[in-house]
């Protein structure tokens, strides 16, 4: 077979590429981190905000703390000021004064197993004051719009610190050639 004949007879497009882990995944033999249980291991679960924008008025964790098998219950007050993010550290580990999106973490539980952790989460009582949501980017850019990130001057990771908090941030990086 000549090189030219081989190249015209062999086709890669339109063919399935077998995955090395495919059989294990479809048969249920594959192991994921959620499948691993170690002696003495604790399970963690988070309680998340049902509101897109709200002030946290109170959090009562008393009942959750008294569930047998619960080792710890944390709220934003326990980790106040600790922020994370890939480049700009602007996401609280747990929200403490207000929430900015549906699903933002508000409390966390560590327990002996997943069911106990969930039962404890279900007992946490949170009182919110729902605030107006900014759903339109043009409305969010107006001077009188409520700030999405009122603490932004304390964030780590800005290429240059803004002079005052704002919902508008512009950064341009240009390059030319090599």
Give, region by region, the residue ranges found by the protein language model.
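Flexible, low-hydrophobicity surface segments
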Residues: 2-177
């Amino acid at each position: 077979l000549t090189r030219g004949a081989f190249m015209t007879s062999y086709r890669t497009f339109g063919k399935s590429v077998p995955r090395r882990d495919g059989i294990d995944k479809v048969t249920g033999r594959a192991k994921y981190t959620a499948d691993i249980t170690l002696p003495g291991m604790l399970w963690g679960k988070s309680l998340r905000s049902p509101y897109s924008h709200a002030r946290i008025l109170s959090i009562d964790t008393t009942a959750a703390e008294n569930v047998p098998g619960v080792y710890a219950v944390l709220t934003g007050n326990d980790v106040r000021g600790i922020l994370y993010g890939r480049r700009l550290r602007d996401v609280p580990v747990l929200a403490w004064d207000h929430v900015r999106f549906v699903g933002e973490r508000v409390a966390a539980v560590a327990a002996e197993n997943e069911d106990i952790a969930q039962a404890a989460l279900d007992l946490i009582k949170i009182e919110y004051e729902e605030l107006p949501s900014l759903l339109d980017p043009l409305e969010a850019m107006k001077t009188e719009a409520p700030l999405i990130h009122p603490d932004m001057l304390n964030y780590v990771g800005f290429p240059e610190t803004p002079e005052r908090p704002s919902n508008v941030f512009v950064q341009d990086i240009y390059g030319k050639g090599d």
